[in-house]
Swiss-Prot record:
Gene symbol of the encoding locus: uvrA
GO MF entries: ATP binding; ATP hydrolysis activity; DNA binding; excinuclease ABC activity; zinc ion binding
HAMAP family, per database record: UvrA
Protein name in UniProt: UvrABC system protein A
Homology family: Belongs to the ABC transporter superfamily. UvrA family.
Subunit architecture: Forms a heterotetramer with UvrB during the search for lesions.
Source species of the chain: Haemophilus ducreyi (strain 35000HP / ATCC 700724)
Pfam families in alphabetical order: UvrA_DNA-bind, UvrA_inter
């Protein structure tokens, strides 16, 4: 078949659509947020493609796979096995890294095991294993007639008299030994000092080099290796100062005997006990009690509470500190910061001195004991380890922090693995390089002879996989980067690169906005990757709003016309040119330039006396930058992926502002020197795209605070008062008014083992969540269930006469959420929808005009028309006097900003600098900025 034929798709809000999609093409599905794009791409096409493949497996195999729900569709023909690449975080496993996800680490392990050069950590000498034949051949290269002796080292730099050893050697028939560099007769050995280190090497054979002695020499080497374990030495009998030949039968250092077993791939795996650092078990980090968290207020004294739980109110612990203060003669009322460094060290880490302590027991008797002081940090660590109380453990956990493991320096690998090199680089050093740098390293790597042959195929796989990651714009990441720290867009592009590496043909790939988090500069490379995937012989279906992606598509499907109940129809399909000619297509109108987001006619000037200045920010790749944000304006933080935007705003500015304005106690602030200007704000709010709730019970009505006044209305009706129902009666979270059969969920979960779990409507309440008595109470003819089933638009009209409710509903309409239902489960909301629910909640609150709002890529999942609506909301917040800081790549947002801070010039180590700060027009003139190049083009369009 040359096409995918869909008939009667009704999944979620799809209106019984019929659609024919070409196979082996790049197809972009676009439309307003909530119009039904994901319902078509993921919940219909992908779900059915995956379901059909999984159903072909045995019932036994199916129980290990999560089978998707059968979509509500009459008929689909022409489907291939489907692979979905979504924007989910790749893994919450701390052992998962970019290298392990992409399997590059597996190839690196194989490479190091086969062609790596082990070295001694102490002497930096290569560890080389030799056969007896190689040893004999080497000796036979010496001049004919040269007098040599073969030694077997049996003791190396070890204390002791070694009397028994020397006696055993004599009994075994050995005549001579070299002891501490001197040849001695074993019949009369020297007396060795017990407390000194000695080296004893047995003379196994003495010979002149002759061509007919190879078999004798081989036997002598066998004896020497057996005697020493694995090492043999050839020394010149006539010239004691001549260089000696050291041979090893195992991977061992010729100087100290440091040895390795045969190199295997598992030695280089931090997920295998053979390779993992024994201190941190391969995690690369270790937990420790952080002095900065323990001493929360160094400007006050120990007596006044510099260390929480050890002040005057805690009789036992304070008595310990009092005794320590008495012994070391310092004042317990002196501020902790003013105590000598040595005293601070003793308080935190303890002392080996015997100190007299006085205790009061249960009978108020004073008891005296003399012992060492373990220190506050050691005390906490011991209690954390020994306690069986979860409450104590949770309290102590507040003082714990993570740091790079001191034993492996965060590399996760044991010492043996860290001391294997390829061209002077070990595995952790390669994993720490950015992907771009790693690719350059392997492209320039030249191995010789047999090593080159062995490594050829492995290197080809490594280079290809690294190139795929560069092609999807991830050259700034390192292979050692933990999967937990990746954004949704980064995780998706890593999976995309892995799929290209797999080289599958005849597959249907479904992607969700792969351009998220990607700068315009990297967009072209991403699109080339998608085209490459198509050219392999695959159907690539992309849910996307990016203009470049839409124009590059072979086939576009525009879903609309509106969102939610107003969407679910195919408005237009075809090429970009065809879409632009269809008046009903909002996407087509924007592509044709008939509709657009206008550039402000004039920029709002900033007040030089009202600035937020963050100095010396140096977290991750930031290079001591100074960030200037004008108060009361709309600021955009721009820059290529990995340039340091999130580190600067999310990891530095936001936690600092939280601590100062919201009374948070965050200690995970990235390094900085100073911050000035927070006095201009009364609170900071981060509006991100995380879910507004993780259970079916949470919904827009409960999150925005709408549900409380609605329940109060129902409780105030004549019927409710007559029955004695209060507000709690109309809650589905507590006993009373809810249906107890489903506990207010409205559905019952049925586990089906090798089929997906089925949620069936509750038999008792028929999915209405409330019991019959509660549903008998009506407000204006509607039950509480019917109100929750209303869309925001319907509810706005219904509650028009109730200002407290109408105002909150209007803010939801203002942010473009008129189509969602009040009781819609939060788990069904997209990231963009969840973010706009949060925005609406903030808009509905009484505004002081002194709020600092931080948003990270708010345009995720938003169509051109949605972005226009979002910008109207952000500009409204700005016009009320608030300060808006947005991390964004979308040029329509950037061009409407009052102020831009552009980071770069590149990602990773090549970034971390502020390239430009100023109005969009100022930044567009900056020659070293990638953002400027694209900004110039869009400003010229007007």
């Amino acid at each position: 078949m040359k096409s995918i034929d869909i008939r009667g798709a009704r999944t979620h809000n799809l209106k019984n659509i019929n659609l024919i999609l070409p196979r082996d093409k790049l197809i972009v599905i676009t439309g307003l947020s909530g119009s039904g794009k994901s319902s078509l791409a993921f919940d219909t096409l992908y779900a059915e493609g995956q379901r059909r493949y999984v159903e072909s497996l045995s019932a036994y195999a199916r129980q290990f796979l999560s089978l998707m729900e059968k979509p509500d569709v009459d008929h689909i023909e022409g489907l291939s096995p489907a692979i979905s690449i979504e924007q989910k975080s790749t893994s919450h496993n701390p052992r998962s890294t970019v290298g392990t996800i992409t399997e590059i680490h597996d190839y690196l392990r194989l490479l190091f095991a086969r062609v790596g050069e082990p070295r001694c950590p102490k002497h930096d000498l290569p560890l080389v294993a030799q056969t007896i034949s190689q040893m004999v051949d080497r000796v036979m290269q010496e001049p004919e007639g040269k007098r040599l002796m073969l030694l077997a080292p049996v003791v190396r730099n070890r204390k002791g008299e070694h009397v028994k050893l020397l006696e055993n050697l004599t009994a075994s028939g050995y005549i001579r030994a070299r002891i501490n560099g001197e040849i001695c007769d074993l019949s009369d050995p020297p007396v060795l000092e017990l407390q000194k280190k000695h080296t004893i090497e047995v003379v196994v054979d003495r010979f002149k080099v002759r061509s007919d002695m190879m078999s004798r020499l081989a036997e002598s080497f066998e004896t020497a290796l057996e005697l020493s374990g694995s090492t043999a030495i050839i020394a010149d009998m006539d010239d004691p100062g001549a260089p000696e030949m050291v041979f090893s039968a195992s991977f061992a250092c010729s100087e100290c005997g440091y040895s390795l077993p045969e190199l295997e791939p598992r030695l280089f795996s931090f997920n295998n006990p053979a390779g993992a650092c024994p201190t941190c078990d391969g995690l690369g980090v270790e937990q420790y009690f952080d002095p900065a968290k323990v001493v929360q207020n160094p400007d006050v004294s120990l007596a006044s509470g510099a260390i929480k739980g050890w002040d005057r109110r805690s009789l036992y612990y304070f008595s310990l500190l009092t005794a320590v203060a008495s012994y070391y003669a310092f004042d317990i009322d002196t501020p902790f910061a003013q105590l000598p460094a040595k005293i601070q060290q003793i308080i935190l880490y303890g002392s080996s001195d015997e100190i007299e302590f006085f205790y009061i027991n249960d009978r108020d008797d004073k008891i005296q004991r003399k012992h060492t002081f373990e220190g506050v940090l050691n005390n906490m660590a011991r209690r954390y380890k020994e306690t069986e109380s979860n409450a104590v453990r949770d309290e102590l956990a507040k003082y714990i922090n993570n740091r790079a493991c001191l034993a492996c320096q965060g590399s996760r690998l044991r010492q043996e693995a860290r001391n294997v090199f390829i061209e002077q680089a070990n595995l952790p050093e390669i994993a720490e390089k950015s992907i771009g740098e790693a690719l350059t390293f392997f492209e320039q790597l030249e191995l010789n002879g047999q090593r080159a042959q062995i490594a050829e195929k492995i290197l080809k796989e490594i280079r290809e996989r690294l190139q795929f990651l560069v092609n999807v714009g991830l050259n700034y990441l390192s292979l050692s980067r933990s999967a937990e720290t990746l954004s949704g867009g980064e995780a998706q592009r890593i999976r995309l690169a892995s799929q290209i590496g797999a080289g599958l043909v005849g597959v249907m790939y479904v992607l969700d906005e792969p351009s998220i988090g990607l700068h315009q500069r990297d967009n072209e490379r991403l699109l080339n990757t998608l085209i490459h995937l198509r050219d392999l012989g695959n159907t690539v279906i992309v849910v996307e709003h990016d203009e470049d992606a839409i124009r590059a598509a072979d086939h576009i499907v525009d879903i609309g016309p509106g969102a939610g109940v107003h969407g679910g129809q195919v408005i237009a399909q075809g090429s970009a040119t065809e879409i632009m000619q269809i008046e009903a297509s909002i996407t087509g109108q924007y592509l044709a330039g008939k509709q657009k987001i206008e550039i402000p006619t004039e920029r709002i000037p900033y007040d030089a006396n009202k600035l937020l200045i963050l100095s010396g920010a140096s977290g991750n790749n930031l290079k001591h930058v100074e960030l200037v944000i004008p108060v009361g304006l709309f600021t955009c933080i721009t820059g290529v992926s990995g340039s340091g935007k999130s580190t600067l705003i999310n990891d530095t500015l936001f936690p600092l502002a939280q601590n100062a304005l919201n009374r948070a106690e965050r200690t995970d602030v990235a390094p900085y020197q100073a911050i000035d200007g927070l006095a201009h704000f009364d609170k900071v709010i981060d509006i991100d795209q995380s879910p507004i709730g993780r259970t079916p019970r949470s919904n827009p009505a409960t999150y925005t605070g709408l549900f409380t006044p609605i329940r109060e209305l129902f409780a105030g009706t004549q019927e409710a008062r007559a029955r004695g129902y209060n507000v709690g009666r109309f809650s589905f979270n507590v006993r009373g008014g809810r249906c107890e059969a489903c506990q207010g969920d409205g559905v019952i979960k049925v586990e089906m083992h090798f089929l997906p779990d089925v949620y069936v409507p509750c038999d008792h309440c028929k999915g209405k969540r409330y019991n019959r008595e509660t549903l008998e109470v009506r407000y204006k003819g509607k039950t509480i269930h019917q109100v929750l089933e209303m869309t925001v638009e319907e509810a706005r009209e219904f509650f028009d006469a109730i200002p407290a409710i109408a105002r909150k509903l209007q803010t939801l309409i203002d942010v473009g959420l008129s189509y969602i239902r009040l009781g819609q489960s939060s788990t069904t909301l997209s990231g963009g929808e969840a973010q706009r629910v949060k925005l609406a909640t903030e808009l509905s609150k009484r505004d002081t005009g002194k709020t600092l709002y931080i948003l990270d890529e708010p345009t995720t999942g938003l169509h051109f028309a949605d972005i226009k609506q979002l910008l109207a909301v952000l500009h409204k917040l700005r016009d009320q006097g608030n300060t808006i800081v947005v991390i964004e790549h979308n040029l329509d947002v950037i061009k409407t900003a009052d102020w831009i801070v552009d980071l770069g010039p590149e990602g990773g180590a090549g970034g971390g600098q502020i390239i430009a700060q100023g109005t969009p027009e100022d930044v567009a003139q900056q020659p070293g900025s990638h953002t400027a190049r694209f900004l110039t083009q869009i400003l010229a369009k007007g």
